[in-house]
Amino acid sequence: MSISKATRIKVYEKYGGHCAYCGCELAYKDMQVDHFVPQHGYFQTGSDEIKNLMPSCRTCNHYKRANPLELWRVFIREIPLKLRSGNYIYKVGLKYGLIVEHEHPIEFYFERVERERAEAQGGES
């Protein structure tokens, strides 16, 4: 189903013109609309509701594909392991300190924005 221009504008504005996942700035024309819960996760209706649509850059939309968020989070977390196991240039970069790996929780941009909004509202008296 095609998403209307009015809906696309609302999706674009959800996170102030940023990708909901990595947080990069998006030009409206470059935004891709991602289904937060994959379309096959809905029973016929609901997949194109605003609450299920996320502004996404091409890279994030490509790699998230039709995966649920937690599966994609695991995929991202495992990137260094995949690079170490099969990429000679990456191994050399690690060996010479050109690449430094950091283990930290994967927090998507929309999660950070929503957490900060909640903290700001909680701090108001």
Sequence positions of predicted segments:
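Extended charged
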Residues: M1-K10, C24-Y28, K51-M54, H62-S125
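A general structural-boundary detector
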Residues: A6-I9, H40-Q44, T59
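Sequence/structural segment immediately N-terminal to covalent heme-attachment motifs in c-type
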Residues: K10-G17
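Short cysteine-rich clusters marking metal-coordination/redox-active sites
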Residues: C19-C22, C57
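Short hydrophobic alpha-helical module
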Residues: C22-E25, Q39
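Canonical RING-type zinc finger of E3 ubiquitin-protein ligases
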Residues: K29-V33
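Histidine-centered active-site/metal-ligand motif
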Residues: H35, N61
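Short linker/helix segments within small regulatory modules
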Residues: V37-L53
